[in-house]
């Protein structure tokens, strides 16, 4: 996304603004962060303000499934941890592609399930035991529940929508040259492509 010298980037499911801030620091573009959680947007605004990026970053309330923007508004788009939380990933991808100019880059970051049996077992143990306990120790009972939810949520998503299905869904949504790269020993995946011209 940053290699195309964009002027305006949309960051969907921006949460507290980590990716939004990174985009603002690595480009001269204006960045719009969108999230459905008012609390996440409050945290994001505090992060943006404390980083001195308020002049180029704006945060708006909205859903990835129904974006409040006209067709072909943005030069590029990113989204993070979104498709596990929507009812219709194909329709959501089409909606994301709709607001990107033809040829514009689209990229996502998502958790994944490692392909290797050994790493998958280690990942399963980590997400079912270590993550909930660490959540509880650092953030209390609420984060314990988040930790317990995350592993099964990721597993169920990839059982329902394996990687080849997701790549096909990107292409079906009007995104060309789709590629993906596993990271963190298979516990994460970056996917990217370009809006059909």
Predicted segments with their positions:
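Conserved beta-strand signature within the Rossmann-like core of class I S-adenosyl-L-methionine
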Residues: 104-111
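Class I SAM-dependent methyltransferase SAM/SAH-binding core
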Residues: 8-66
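Short "lid" loop at the C-terminus of a central beta-strand within the Rossmann-like core
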Residues: 83, 111-115, 185
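A short SAM/SAH-binding and catalytic strip from SAM-dependent methyltransferases
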Residues: 75-89
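Core SAM-dependent methyltransferase catalytic element
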Residues: 173-197
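A short glycine-rich, Lys/Arg-flanked "PGG" loop and its adjoining helix->strand segment in the class I
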Residues: 90-102
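C-terminal alpha-helical "lid/dimerization" subdomain adjacent to the S-adenosyl-L-methionine
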Residues: 36, 113-169, 179
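A short acidic, Gly/Pro-enriched loop at the edge of an enzyme's catalytic core
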Residues: 65-76
